[in-house]
Amino acid sequence: MAGPAAHFSDEQFREACAELQKPALTGADWQLLVEASGITIYRLLDQSTGLYEYKVFGVLESCIPSLLADVYMDLDYRKKWDQYVKELYEKSFDGQMVAYWEVKYPFPLSNRDYVYTRQRRDLDVDGRKIYVVLAQNISVPQFPEKSGVIRVKQYKQSLAIESDGKKGSRVFMYYFDNPGGQIPSWLINWAAKNGVPSFLKDMVKACQNYHKKT
């Protein structure tokens, strides 16, 4: 049986790096959604789904890039600090790591789950150390859909991190997520507007409490 295909090209990693230096917001109808606590979020309507793509820019103080990247990649640790995680783990299929992630949704909505692959690269770009993580949904028979949980079949995320020149990190994040089902648009917008800054704050706190396992 063929394994899940690799999704990430060198160009995708370069594009994420480039956004840190010069955000690519021209040539499309990117709208400013929110600007607060050092975090700026833009959104772009995806015509095919009626949902939005998001770009997030900001500085996370008191968390150095290498630590932030380690915390982001550590799924076991995320189960301790992310209150919305119900289940999260990785398995290897034909030499490629595949992650399973179930997210708690508020009643009466059904939980969502994701099956995705991800890759981290620590890059040197013109003397700048940049940590990039790319993630995208895939379909593998080893993770069939569960009864009562809605499978997210469109999910894509990019994260790029570099030093802010002090003791913090400059961050770029792109994500698109089609949660499926009948979720009111106001709730999706609220989650993007409030959930992302809240997640980043939680991640900074997680960095401060993180002790890398040896």
Curated annotation (Swiss-Prot):
Protein name stated in the entry: Phosphatidylcholine transfer protein
Which residues bind a 1,2-diacyl-sn-glycero-3-phosphocholine per the record? Y72, R78, Q157
Q: Does the keyword Phosphoprotein apply?
A: yes
Q: Which residues carry this modification: Phosphoserine?
A: S139
Keywords of this protein's UniProt record, alphabetized?
Answer: Acetylation, Cytoplasm, Lipid transport, Lipid-binding, Phosphoprotein, Transport
The START domain extends over 1-212
Quaternary state and partners of this protein? Interacts with ACOT13/THEM2.
- Where is this chain's protein located in or outside the cell? Cytoplasm
